[in-house]
């Protein structure tokens, strides 16, 4: 198993700052607001999601047992029926969004979360990413100003060292970012620093590293291999990861997904370690857990391999909780 290598990489990442990346050779092209308009079927689905979500809670709790994520206010299996739970909860916790200043780490101007917030009545939206999108942003800014009301800014930097004064924002949202942040301790403290008193931070992240397919790519080999990033030794894992012929046959999307594993850009944290980082930074609020359907299937169909994972010291919670949604107040 690769656990020693994972622990080593986790320690290295925890004491570092995420490297920054220069301007990509291919610039971002502006997408009009119509590109992000929800289909009628999607709007109908969002309307019924809260009811379906509530009706499935007992079923999903029975599926994993009481020991898995007892800290979670709700559970979801593969994100089903969660809908716009994040924004509903954030408004209950921090009030209406109108007139507020929003920070979106890990975003550029075409990101879905950017356009979601620009379509609201917030005062400003500030983007920051480890990739330098400055040139593309400056070209797109006149078009963005024509279509959206909020003030929009874009910065180049990392979560561990945010280039903003204390208490600059009312809201922070990240989507699929925190699973890649190595120094979560520093990132959580920085987000708390730039958030105003009473401000709300929304984080949806995953897959978490110890869950099924947690390296973002090994699950492409099939349902029996979703924990190979943990079960294989380092040499065998690297051979599987870098098998160009195999991934070429799987298609470009699955092949490109290897980027994160090859670069080792993960936090390597368990769900409870994330919660501790938030707590120490001064956040409190509600947490929702996303369960892995493929992880539950593996536990049922591969009992010997599952036992090996658990006996190696990985909790069933870390193996089955593939993602988290946190809505927390400073």
For each feature predicted by the language model, list its residue ranges:
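Short catalytic micro-motifs in class I SAM-dependent methyltransferases
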Residues: 176-180
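Short conserved loop adjoining the S-adenosyl-L-methionine
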Residues: 161-166, 193
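A conserved beta-strand element that flanks and buttresses the S-adenosyl-L-methionine
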Residues: 173
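Class I SAM-dependent methyltransferase Rossmann-like catalytic core
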Residues: 47-95
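Conserved class I S-adenosyl-L-methionine
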Residues: 200-244
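A C-terminal cap/extension of S-adenosyl-L-methionine-dependent methyltransferases
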Residues: 2-11, 147-152, 254, 258-330
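Class I SAM-dependent methyltransferase SAM/SAH-binding core
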Residues: 103-161
